[in-house]
Amino acid sequence: TMNGASGSGYLEQISGMVDVKQWSRWFAFMTIILSRETNLSNGTDDDYKLYRGVKDPRIKLVPHDFDTIFGLGDTDTDADDSIFPAITNFAGQTIPQLNRFFSDPVILRQYYSDLKDLLNTVFEKSRFDALVSNSLDWLPSDSDVSDDVIGFMDERRAYILNQIPSEFTVSSNLPSSDGFSRTEE
């Protein structure tokens, strides 16, 4: 189980139980839309479904209840809320297994990659704005909902992209020659 998985083989241990890539993408999606409906994406064991297939028995996450997203709904949100809402829960609850999940370096890289991919495709500004404008065109002309959602997403997109580490550093104890670490071994 995920409860018993730990140590250097953590990823291998859970990969047979859960679809790690799907979970990473699900968490990235829910983080981007900033779901404030209590669910696994924000560290609460509520309002989500699990799916286990026959051919692929790894557990997949299925979202539902989207009435508190993009800064809308009955729960205050800020576009600059954490990109790790599953472990920095706004309601003060935590699920220890998610701390371990996001602490794995391979999963963390996948999560960052999924955030960037979704923000540069599905949530890319022109695509997202058109989707919102076309989907909410039934609202009264004096409604600010479309503008509010678009504005929120602009802020959220910028904030998330700014949180994803982009620098790559390497350190070494090799001897230096002409400013580069070198070895003959």
Per-segment meaning from a language model:
Residues 1-184:
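Catalytic-core segments of enzymes that bind and process phosphorylated/nucleotide-bearing substrates
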